[in-house]
C-alpha cells in the first residue's frame, strides 16, 4: 500500500511539473512592478512611462525607436514582456534586482546598433532595459575630460565636446547615432584610430550596476572588471551607466577628401598600393577604403573609394601623398579644409558640412533602418593583385556586397595586445563585410544571408586564420552562439577566441568572479568557467 501511494505521489508530481507553465504576462508584470516599486520607493503611478508592459501605449514606440536593422522589426520578431525605460540609476538597479528575482533574461540597449539585435531580442522570456534616457554628458575642458552616459549617442558626445571646447575631440566612431555604452565597451574606433588608438584607451573611470544591483566605479569594481568592460563588451558583466573619458587635442584645421576609381580606371593598382601606404603613413592620416560592385556604361565593375581625414592642412597631405601614393591621383579639388566638428558631419554623409550647423548631430534618429547583415575580418599580409582580382570578380557575382577596409598602424601597432580585451592592434587593417537590401520577407532574407556567407568563405584565404579574427562590435551570430549544457564553455570558446584571442581566458575568469550565476547572458556573452553553476 505504501509503495502504491508513493507511485501515485510520483505520478502526480510528474504531471504537475509537466503541466507547469510560465506565469501569464499580467502576473509577470504585476510581480515585477511590485518589486520595482519596493526597490525604488516610487509610487506605482509614477512609473507608467518607465515600466512598460506590452499593453502600454508607449511599449511599441519605445521598443522600435532604437531598432536599427529592419530584419528585427517584423511581426515575427520576439518581443520582450516588459521594456524598462530607465530614467535614473535607481531604475537600472531595480531592473537588475527584480529581473534577477523573477529568473528572466535582461537585455540592455543603449543605441540599438547591435548588428544581430542581441541587445533587444531573445528566444526565451526576456525584458529590455532601454538606456536611451540616461544620456547626460558633462564636459570639463579644464581637466580635458568628460562623463558620458551610456545612452548618449556619439553625435551627442561630439556636439557637447565642441560646445565647450573647439580644440578637443574624442576618438570614436563616425556614425553619430551609435550609442556610447555599447560602442565604447566593445573597444570603439573611428577615423582618429591611427593617431590616438581606440576609444577605450581614453576611458579613465566608469560606473556600472553589477549583478547585485550595486553601483560601482572603477575603484569599487576593481581593475580586473574595469579592464573587462573596456573592450570585452560590458553586457557580460553588468549594466554600464557611464564612462569617464579623456579628450584628445584636434587642430584648428583638418582636411577631408574622397577619390573614386573603377576597374577600368586602374582601381586594382590603387587598392593594392593602399595596403602598403594606409597602415604606414603619417598617423594623422586615416584613409578608409570602400569597395562596391556597380554598373558603369552598362558594364559591371567594382568602385573603389578612398575616404580620408587628415589632421592638418591640405597642402601637407597633398605633398605627402604625391610622393607616397601616386596611384591615388589626389588632386587639390578633391580636398576640403574644415574644422574637426565639420569633419564629423562630413563623415556622417553630409557633403555640405561647412554650411550646416553642428546641432544636426543631436538628431538621434536621422537614418531609416534597412535590412542588413555584417561580418568582419582582419588582414595581416597584403593581398596580391591576383587575389584582389579574384575578390572583385566574386563581388560582382554576389552583388550588393560592400567592403570597408580600415587601416591600422600608427599608435595602434605600439600598444600591447593585452592592454585591453581588444587583441587586434598589430593587424594591417580590418574589413567590414556589408550586405544591405530593401526587400522584406523570409525569401529575400534567406537569399542575402546566404550570399553574405558565401562571400565570407571567398575571403578566407586572405585573412587571419586559427582563429579567424573578428570584431565584437560587428556582431556575427554565424560564428557561434552560446548553448546550455556541459559543452557550453567549449562552444563559447570558439567564437570567444575569434573576438578576443588570448584575452578570452582573462575575460572568462573575470566573468566567473563577478557573475558566477551567469545572470548577464546573451547569445555571445562571456561564459563562466566549466564546472561553475550557471543560469540557463
From Swiss-Prot:
InterPro entries: BBE, FAD-bd_PCMH, FAD-bd_PCMH-like_sf, FAD-bd_PCMH_sub1, FAD-bd_PCMH_sub2, Oxid_FAD_bind_N. Its cofactor is FAD. GO terms for molecular function: FAD binding; oxidoreductase activity, acting on the CH-OH group of donors, oxygen as acceptor. The FAD cofactor is bound via a bicovalent 6-S-cysteinyl, 8alpha-N1-histidyl FAD linkage. It holds the Pfam family FAD_binding_4. Residues 1-20 form the signal peptide. Glycans are attached at residues 38, 73, 136, 266, 334, 352. Residues 76-250 form the FAD-binding PCMH-type domain. It is an enzyme of class 1 (oxidoreductase). Disulfide bonds join 35-98. One of its GO terms (cellular component) is plant-type cell wall. Binds 1 FAD per subunit in a bicovalent manner. Belongs to the oxygen-dependent FAD-linked oxidoreductase family. This is Berberine bridge enzyme-like 2.
